[in-house]
Amino acid sequence: MSNLQAVIEEAFERRADITPKTVDAATRAAIEEVIEGLDSGKFRVAEKIDGEWVTHQWLKKAVLLSFRINENEIIDGAETKYYDKVALKFADYSEERFAQEGFRVVPSATVRKGAYISKNTVLMPSYVNIGAYVGEGTMVDTWATVGSCAQIGKNVHLSGGVGIGGVLEPLQANPTIIGDNCFIGARSEVVEGVIVEDGCVISMGVFIGQSTKIYDRETGEIHYGRVPAGSVVVSGSLPSKDGKYSLYCAVIVKKVDAKTLGKVGINELLRSIEE
């Protein structure tokens, strides 16, 4: 355990006693170092190690602690003012820094300090919360929300109105993760630490939480909390045990490999689900 992690872990145990007025200098410095590290991409709340996603709980704890040590203050916006404990990521950015970091931010997009945005990312009028990581080449479309500590892979498209759940409110054990080369259709929601593995296509209006049945129509298998790599998923329903009613589920209608995903358009994949 690093010294930084040790300070965070110890502070979290006494978090109820920490306020902006009582926090000691060493604890404040450690928390701010973590937030800066998350902001720059040095730290990630979750990362893939030996093929498995690992959550660094101490980083999440630092994010939670950051709310304990800061007072609300005025935040200036172009059209209004805000009043919050967390600064905005781009408050001090110059044109040169935007150009250097290599992403686009459309007016009304909001990113909190402590979120990392990779090169070649486009942020339409959307919201990215503290602790989140957005991978290279990703499009966060209009009114999409990337929740606190959520992990978004490379070359992902989060369509209009998509919601990717956070870990802070309500408190979740693990962040929601969207793998590389995924497409999440408009108004879909992926929450509660669900993992969408690489190369998945999620149709419009699909809602997936930890208790959602994810039914593979080819195998009959039911998954919880994980969408297998290469899945094409639509909303559906499954009959109850007594056959009297149906309950919502997500349905894996087919699997595609990276080569097929690269060659075939998203609309074609979704329109051919009856094949």
From Swiss-Prot:
One GO process term, biological-process aspect: lysine biosynthetic process via diaminopimelate
Catalytic EC class: transferase
Keyword Translocase attributed: no
Pathway: Amino-acid biosynthesis; L-lysine biosynthesis via DAP pathway; LL-2,6-diaminopimelate from (S)-tetrahydrodipicolinate (succinylase route): step 1/3
Binding site for substrate: R104, D141
UniProt keyword Amino-acid biosynthesis, yes or no: yes
Record field: catalytic activity: (S)-2,3,4,5-tetrahydrodipicolinate + succinyl-CoA + H2O = (S)-2-succinylamino-6-oxoheptanedioate + CoA
Protein name: 2,3,4,5-tetrahydropyridine-2,6-dicarboxylate N-succinyltransferase
Listed EC numbers: 2.3.1.117
